[in-house]
Swiss-Prot record:
GO process terms (BP): translation
Organism: Campylobacter curvus (strain 525.92)
Family: Belongs to the universal ribosomal protein uL5 family.
Subunit record text: Part of the 50S ribosomal subunit; part of the 5S rRNA/L5/L18/L25 subcomplex. Contacts the 5S rRNA and the P site tRNA. Forms a bridge to the 30S subunit in the 70S ribosome.
PANTHER family: 60S RIBOSOMAL PROTEIN L11-RELATED (PTHR11994)
The protein's name in its UniProt record: Large ribosomal subunit protein uL5
Keywords: Ribonucleoprotein, Ribosomal protein, RNA-binding, rRNA-binding, tRNA-binding
Purpose of the protein: This is one of the proteins that bind and probably mediate the attachment of the 5S RNA into the large ribosomal subunit, where it forms part of the central protuberance. In the 70S ribosome it contacts protein S13 of the 30S subunit (bridge B1b), connecting the 2 subunits; this bridge is implicated in subunit movement. Contacts the P site tRNA; the 5S rRNA and some of its associated proteins might help stabilize positioning of ribosome-bound tRNAs.
Gene Ontology CC entries for this record: ribonucleoprotein complex; ribosome
GO molecular function terms listed in the Swiss-Prot or TrEMBL record: rRNA binding; structural constituent of ribosome; tRNA binding
Keyword Ribonucleoprotein: yes
Amino acid sequence: MGRLKDKFNESIKPALVKEFDIKNPMLVPALEKIVISVGAGDFAKDQKVLQNMADTISLIAGQKAVITNAKKSVAGFKVREGFPVGIKVTLRKEQMYAFLDKLISIALPRVKDFRGLPKNGFDGRGNYNFGLSEQLMFPEVEYDKILRTHGMNITIATTAKNDKEAFKLLELFGLPFAKGK
């Protein structure tokens, strides 16, 4: 098992049971999935750049990324149905814990002037969203092989009922939140 999965079972789960006075062990908040997504934006027309972005996300996640296509045509955005609009990868189980461990212990400490993740990324249902401005903080990414730098959105879905439980869960995992508000 992964380091964070062991940490969850040995120390985080009992701490959450104690703090939130949970009687049923199946109701303890846990990680459900992590979704990494990138909007293609202006690069959607260039197939080479789009494939390079997908390969980069696949390297970071350790799982093949999927190019997502538009479901409907939107004239205002100059998008046609079936047009590539982004890239995503969904991580569950062991790969999810491995990615979170890499994010917390390697990638985020390499961000220049990092002050912590914003606390306002919770959606009210126990899920947390945040964005990273570039992909170069991950050790798998080689600067020479990148055609364009791009950011990414990371969504951490939990089984928590509310933001307070989700915040405590992610804080116990070691996600560095910004001090203050």
